Amino acid sequence: MKYALSNEGRIEATPKANGICQCCESYLIAKCGTQKIWHWAHKGKRNCDHWWENETQWHRDWKDYFPKEWQEVVHLSDDGEKHIADVKTPNGLVVEFQHSAISLKEKLSRETFYKDMIWVVDGRRLERDFQRFNESFRTSDWRHWGPFVRKNRIPSRSLPKSWQSSKKLVFFDWGFVKSEYWIKDWHSHLICLLPETDELGWLQLIAIEREQFTEIVSNSSNLDSNSLFW
């Protein structure tokens, strides 16, 4: 994790630093090597939050789009269950950044636990996922819905099935890639998968600029597809 508690408040890992886990209040070890990003870890292989995944630079870069106070916030349910949200805004919206594979059971558990949440998925993890997604636009056209938003529909085979059952908005980050089927500068957009298919069972997508995405997230709660059309 990025932050630990100390006498100075929340601090990032530095060599020989001491910290306390904000979730379980146990001592943390500052991991400051050369192979991985500097982070805090529990002793041994223990981790108090089983939803937590090892962070990559991709995680850190996304978190840093938002204020430090919003990053790694402990979310407590009515029954006392606790988990660390990647980002939680003052309006109560949780953003989870997912790089590694995730089971359907865990995905649904997180959506039920956080309630008001969205996903940002690292689409670059498997190269074939982007190739399949990119190819689907060979014969499709984006429709304009305002200055920053475009809408489209593609067959279900175009995106990983593991995310098509989500009840929340899923934003795919394909990185700053180039595509012969996308118009100029669209490689900087996020592609949002809506929870609802159209009347023919096709997936519905929204393309939104990164800056506009962070602005909407920062000012919204209970974000849904209607929030993206203004």
Protein language model features and the residues they cover:
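Short hydrophobic alpha-helical runs that function as membrane-insertion/retention elements
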Residues: 116-121
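Non-catalytic C-terminal interaction segments of nucleic acid-processing enzymes
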Residues: 2-9, 13-16, 124-230
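Nuclease-adjacent, charged terminal/linker segments that flank catalytic cores
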Residues: 1-71, 77, 214, 219-230
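Active-site metal-binding core of divalent-cation-utilizing nuclease and nuclease-like domains
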Residues: 11-13, 25-31, 61-109, 128-137, ...
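Short, conserved loop/helix-junction motifs that constitute active-site signature segments
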Residues: 111-114
